[in-house]
Curated annotation (Swiss-Prot):
Record-linked SMART domains: EFh
Species, as recorded: Haemopis marmorata
UniProt function note: May function as a trigger protein which interacts with a larger protein. May mediate calcium-dependent signal transduction events in the growth cones and axons of a small group of sensory neurons which fasciculate in a single axon tract.
Subcellular compartments: Cytoplasm
Chain coiled-coil ranges: none
Cited SUPFAM superfamilies: EF-hand
Protein name: Calsensin
Presence of keyword Repeat: yes
Length: 83
């Protein structure tokens, strides 16, 4: 992964990790998602469902949260698929 992209993704993870514990939880993800126009029109239940799906996709060790490593790996995988 290119250094610039990695730095941008690390900055994004830091914003998502609201309490700074090194993990993004479903609640942190939901809190962020409702600030985005794409999610504002959705009900709370739909946002909760979307965050659960995102966590499931990235959470490789099935602990219910996304570590920085899992976040970086999921984004790297996605970016490779899009190229």
């Amino acid at each position: 992964m290119a250094c610039k992209v990695k730095a941008e993704l690390e900055a994004a993870f830091k914003k998502l990790d609201a309490n700074g514990d090194g993990y993004v939880t479903a609640l942190e993800l939901q809190t962020f998602m409702v600030t985005l126009d794409a999610y504002k029109a959705l009900s709370k239940d739909k946002v909760k469902e979307a965050s659960a799906k995102l966590i499931k996709m990235a959470d490789k060790n099935s602990d219910g949260k996304i570590s920085k490593e899992e976040f970086l790996n999921a984004n790297a995988e996605l970016l490779c698929q899009l190229k």
